[in-house]
């Protein structure tokens, strides 16, 4: 029975049902991203936004992509007052979620972007500092479009596109709800 051809026939069936390997890497925790993006900060005040349907619609119209019902964001303070805002966001790469942090100065200009978690097998090049640097200086109203002012990464097109779309959405969120 152990050498029976029936057992050999069952091997492919077992492999089909086996879980496929996944690739998940956490590069930074939220607190590590906070310190990396705002080294002079003395306090991070949780200001998570709970968006109304009207706010979600306005942000979606401004960004071309709508937000979820809540948006994690921290007001960043230092010895001299508000230093800026730190958003934590998730977008889908090709199949899996990408978690990233976006740092804005007090006026809403991007000062940095860090990838916290990347779960895709391929496309991790979005962690490349030169690619992330393209976002620095962008603000609400900036183009922030893949293939326009943000270069695509070959092999990571969907990850590049979705992070870019997410940044544009967060800039619109700042402009609609936090500016002032």
Residue positions per predicted region:
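Intrinsically disordered, low-complexity segments
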Residues: 1-2, 18-20
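Bacterial N-terminal signal peptides that target proteins for export
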Residues: 1-9
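Bacterial N-terminal signal peptides
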Residues: 8-18
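Flexible, solvent-exposed loop/hinge segments and secondary-structure transition points
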Residues: 19-153, 157-161, 165-180
């Amino acid at each position: 029975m152990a050498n029976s051809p029936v057992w050999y026939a069952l091997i492919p069936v077992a492999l089909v049902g086996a879980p496929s390997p996944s690739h998940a890497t956490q590069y930074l925790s939220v607190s590590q991203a906070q310190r990396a993006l705002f080294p002079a900060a003395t306090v991070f005040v949780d200001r998570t936004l709970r968006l109304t349907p009207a706010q979600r619609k306005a942000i979606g119209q401004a960004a071309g992509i709508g937000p979820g019902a809540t948006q994690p964001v921290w007001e960043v303070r230092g010895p001299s007052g508000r230093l800026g805002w730190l958003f934590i966001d998730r977008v889908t790469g090709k199949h899996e979620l990408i978690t990233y942090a976006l740092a804005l100065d007090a006026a809403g200009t991007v000062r940095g972007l860090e990838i916290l978690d990347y779960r895709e097998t391929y496309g991790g090049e979005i962690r490349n500092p030169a690619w992330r640097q393209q976002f620095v200086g962008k603000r609400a109203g900036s183009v922030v479009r893949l293939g326009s002012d943000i270069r695509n990464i070959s092999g990571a097109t969907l990850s590049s596109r979705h992070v870019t779309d997410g940044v544009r959405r967060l800039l619109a969120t700042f402009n609609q709800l936090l500016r002032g």
